[in-house]
């Protein structure tokens, strides 16, 4: 190779590097063989002088072919055992050469599994990893961007200049670069040059931590230095069937549950004051609580209320508070609005120590168009479909994942494993499943593409959901996977091996709509709507249902639960108590949204906090007390939960008394043959002599009454219970003569004796 040819070639290579158009810097930079010797070739934009430091000796480098490519001829190959001394802009510094670290980070097996869509721990390769190469500490960066012309790491390390750290393209569209000396906390992005020359700055899709919005940089973060103390909890969880357990969920949004005054900063353990993250202009003078503060306040509150789980609306990093977290850009990081990843780990750990499980809302159905996120990631429609008829939700302004692409499915499935493994969560609630299952979801005719059979089912999304649930339960057999699926798609909670989607719970949207419609009707007209109350039992055993009164029902002009109820305040409170008690005694696991537990009046506002001042008023204290006691009643009586999904667990006594709007039923469980009788009166008229058939002779203890004065009721009841009489009704020989309070739910337990005074 002639000297002039080498000079021209190096000038061209240098120009490609300076233009950020190089995809193979390892072919040029670092230690290169040359005519039986070695050339040390260092890329150092805007440097004035560069020297090589090998074993204590300094070797001057010269830029013979390009002003930013510095070279020296060496007799021996030093490997990566050298440093570079740089003089630039009057500043001198010493560093290792990034292009001397050539070992592939993504091995052949990793690349193969990722291309198949089966690398369940891909985050251990992708992203930014604090690591050691050849005895040198630094950060390994790894990114999937197969259609990019070039990719650079930009950050504080290079003044956000993409010319300094071009990445090496590997097999499968993987880009890698080890930057020696970089430390935890360093901010970075990827600068991606597309094939047509456009340049984008992107956050790391696999980043483990990101800046607080509106900043968009990713942050180098450790994922392996938290000491968990919940192994007993995890072992017990994964060795039991959650469907056989009581599940009572408090759904909430971390940023609008409670705020703190902005002039009271959070004090870190080291004594430093943390910069406050403001709540919003709608709530001036306030700031968001941190994960440590939520650990102290929220866990105590949820435990006092008696809930078994907290469900957090999405906490994956997201740029816009108004999306409630449902439009994520940082899928592998808890949002930094509230603190650090390890602080969130400590929050989960503390939940487990108090016997509370943690469920996260997970949103694999779509993602936002923000320029720093996944959209048009490498200059192509990499994560989304290119055709907007299958790749865009016009109504939401978001993009739809391309589930047919193996690497995209891998990104999502591994993300699921990541949250369970890295943050010890106990369950997920998958948002908007119907939008994934149907190609024509919210689309007019002509704006969607049928599947290969001409139908509207999204077979790619079906396969993805099946894969995600299969992998989840393979790794975490005691997990909860809850579907928010609003249609009658069959087999949502059937196992994948029989063609189901593989969830183990599904929100019962039908029950929710029927009951809210029913309770919004004037009680005097409820006799014409009895079917709303009873219909859910006709399909109750087609899926494993969870009853949910969620955030979606208290926004966008729908009013909060209390204000959905008709009548004066007394009736509103009584109706609310009756609905909650019917929910807790109806088959199915339970979820309510924050604020419902004490009768919030205003609609939920993501920029405000709850109306905690209402707890200064007795009726709201009464509703909170009712929820506390419902959770005690629920957890202490297996008849209310053990056989939720077994037809033996429920039996109507009478569901046909629409004239009085009264229903009665039994809840039973097989293990101990325990059972309860529930009687509900959904009118404001009391019934002092209402007879209900019972299966056995004996005394029936009144163990719960929503009309108790401690809940704000009129304290009408049955003096602790009623003994049965030989009076045939409802196809039973025995019955009890009850006093039914207005707008109430009563629960009775068989005591096997004629009166409470008998021994």
UniProtKB/Swiss-Prot annotation:
Presence of the UniProt keyword Transferase in the record: yes
Pathway: Glycan biosynthesis; glycogen biosynthesis
Keywords: Carbohydrate metabolism, Glycogen biosynthesis, Glycogen metabolism, Glycosyltransferase, Transferase
GO cellular component terms given for this protein: cytosol
EC number: 2.4.1.18
The UniProt record lists the keyword Glycosyltransferase: yes
HAMAP family: GlgB
Designated name of the protein: 1,4-alpha-glucan branching enzyme GlgB
Gene label: glgB
